[in-house]
């Protein structure tokens, strides 16, 4: 499959990237090489391979919940530039 400059421009638009003509040319070649490699992988016989989502078995890695002491409000706010009633005060970001 041959990638065109128009396709690279379309992907750049979706990614909100502004590419120079030189970058478009470079990425066209790179994307074409990537897809050529994927096409080569499609030639492999995978009929006896079971589909998987992980290469190795994954088990739940979470630990049991345990109540432990925390650093406390005063220590957490010790270096806060501004605080109010035990909370961080931050600039308003919603208009």
Curated annotation (Swiss-Prot):
<dbReference type="InterPro" id="IPR036113">
    <property type="entry name" value="Asp/Glu-ADT_sf_sub_c"/>
</dbReference>
<dbReference type="GO" id="GO:0070681">
    <property type="term" value="P:glutaminyl-tRNAGln biosynthesis via transamidation"/>
</dbReference>
<keyword id="KW-0547">Nucleotide-binding</keyword>
<dbReference type="GO" id="GO:0006412">
    <property type="term" value="P:translation"/>
</dbReference>
<keyword id="KW-0436">Ligase</keyword>
<comment type="function">
    <text>Allows the formation of correctly charged Asn-tRNA(Asn) or Gln-tRNA(Gln) through the transamidation of misacylated Asp-tRNA(Asn) or Glu-tRNA(Gln) in organisms which lack either or both of asparaginyl-tRNA or glutaminyl-tRNA synthetases. The reaction takes place in the presence of glutamine and ATP through an activated phospho-Asp-tRNA(Asn) or phospho-Glu-tRNA(Gln).</text>
</comment>
<comment type="similarity">
    <text>Belongs to the GatC family.</text>
</comment>
<keyword id="KW-0648">Protein biosynthesis</keyword>
<dbReference type="GO" id="GO:0005524">
    <property type="term" value="F:ATP binding"/>
</dbReference>
<protein>
    <recommendedName>
        <fullName>Aspartyl/glutamyl-tRNA(Asn/Gln) amidotransferase subunit C</fullName>
        <ecNumber>6.3.5.-</ecNumber>
    </recommendedName>
</protein>
<keyword id="KW-0067">ATP-binding</keyword>
<dbReference type="GO" id="GO:0050566">
    <property type="term" value="F:asparaginyl-tRNA synthase (glutamine-hydrolyzing) activity"/>
</dbReference>
<dbReference type="InterPro" id="IPR003837">
    <property type="entry name" value="GatC"/>
</dbReference>
<dbReference type="Pfam" id="PF02686">
    <property type="entry name" value="GatC"/>
</dbReference>
<comment type="subunit">
    <text>Heterotrimer of A, B and C subunits.</text>
</comment>
<dbReference type="GO" id="GO:0050567">
    <property type="term" value="F:glutaminyl-tRNA synthase (glutamine-hydrolyzing) activity"/>
</dbReference>
<dbReference type="GO" id="GO:0006450">
    <property type="term" value="P:regulation of translational fidelity"/>
</dbReference>
């Amino acid at each position: 499959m041959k990638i065109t400059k128009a396709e690279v421009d379309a992907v750049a638009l979706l990614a909100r990237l502004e590419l120079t003509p030189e970058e478009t040319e470079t990425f066209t070649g790179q994307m074409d090489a990537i897809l050529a490699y994927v096409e080569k992988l499609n030639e492999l016989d995978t009929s006896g391979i079971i589909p998987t989502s992980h290469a190795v078995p994954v088990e739940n890695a979470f630990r049991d919940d345990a109540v432990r002491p925390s650093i406390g409000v005063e220590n957490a706010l010790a270096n806060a530039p501004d605080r109010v009633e035990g909370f961080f005060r931050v600039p308003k970001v919603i208009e």
